[in-house]
A protein has these predicted regions:
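Acidic, surface-exposed loops and disordered segments
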Residues: 1-182
Length: 182
């Protein structure tokens, strides 16, 4: 299930999220995610990949590792859709399991490719799932569904340093085994 938010409604959501983030900063922990974005015990090599992309991203932004306030301020831009004029939210029926979650990921990648074909850019933002009640109440997600993810949609700024960032790639042979392929 997809909800697309733009215009005055998106501005309203951005204002709601600014207030919500201020409440969280003041200690309000009443809203909890419905699923973990990462396993509680993320191990190597996945922990290392996650760490490295974070380091590369903040280095491009000129934000030092020890400047937690600047890092949090940057992260909060997620909830402004990075200035994009449109946000997409995806929710899924609670009865669905891992295969359907995979289907949603494949569907969203197809949406992102189709957006690109139409000259639009997108940024998948699973961080929205940290606020399922806030988002669910705003867009009217029924109780039988849960918020899966969000996505910013618009035109990227080619001058922004993050838009030139390319994550390091693991060598193919570290995650692929070939059988009967020469």
């Amino acid at each position: 299930h997809i909800d697309v938010v733009a215009g005055a409604k998106l501005e309203e959501l951005k204002a709601i999220m600014q207030r919500r983030l201020a409440e969280v900063a003041a200690g309000d922990r009443s809203e909890v995610p419905e699923y973990d974005i990462y396993p509680k015990e993320l191990t190597a090599p996945y922990r290392d990949y996650r760490f490295q992309i974070g380091e590369d991203m903040y280095a491009r932004l000129g934000i030092p590792r020890d400047d937690k306030a600047a890092r949090m301020k940057w992260f909060a831009r997620n909830y402004q859709s990075f200035g994009a004029p449109m946000a997409l939210f995806c929710s899924i029926d609670r009865r669905m399991g891992p295969p359907q979650w995979s289907d949603m990921g494949m569907f969203l990648q197809s949406v992102m490719l189709l957006l690109r074909e139409e000259g639009l850019d997108s940024c998948a933002q699973e961080c929205w799932s940290l606020y399922p009640k806030t988002i669910g109440d705003f867009i009217g997600i029924p109780s039988e569904r849960m918020l899966f993810t969000g996505m910013a949609i618009g035109h990227r700024n080619p001058e922004h340093p993050l838009n030139a960032l390319r994550s390091q790639r693991a060598p193919v042979d570290t995650f692929t085994r070939f059988h009967g392929v020469s």
